[in-house]
Amino acid sequence: MSRIGNKTITIPAGCEVTVSDKNEVTVKGPKGTLTRQFSPLIEIKVEGAEVKCVRANEAKQTKQLHGTTRALINNMIVGTTEGFKKQLDIVGIGYRAALQGKVLNLVLGYSHEINYEIEEGITVEVPNNTTIVVSGVDKQRVGEVAAQIRGFRKPEPYKGKGIKYSDEVINRKEGKTAA
């Protein structure tokens, strides 16, 4: 029994959810529109101001998809009404970020600068030269872009230099001691 899948999703005011005959869910909200195709094993019903996911049978795969489908629809509703945000911090002497139009320019101690093209539907802000804020309506794409930016210089465990999530804790290691 999927505890998450059995919960109904309440649709907030200003948000509209429609389900097509091919199990394609479209969520329209004040921040934007998201569309996603779901498995035909899960029936998605919109009843008034609630969305309910009902599984077709008790097979293992159907049970797995039940909770996942409900969580994805909930994330679509939250994204179109509130949006998602990831904050990255740059730690290191001389490490900095700058935004030039739709290109994020990163100086991370390499012999060259890194120019990251920001994709459509994602907003990147640089409040100061050591903080990057990635935001958008699609939770998966926001996390993906933040992970790609972090991947340019992951935080190292000795000095903690690199790009890290603002809520991430870096486990520090002790360096070699002279004998």
Describe the predicted segments one by one:
Residues 2-147, 151-179:
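N-terminal intrinsically disordered, cationic/polar leader segments
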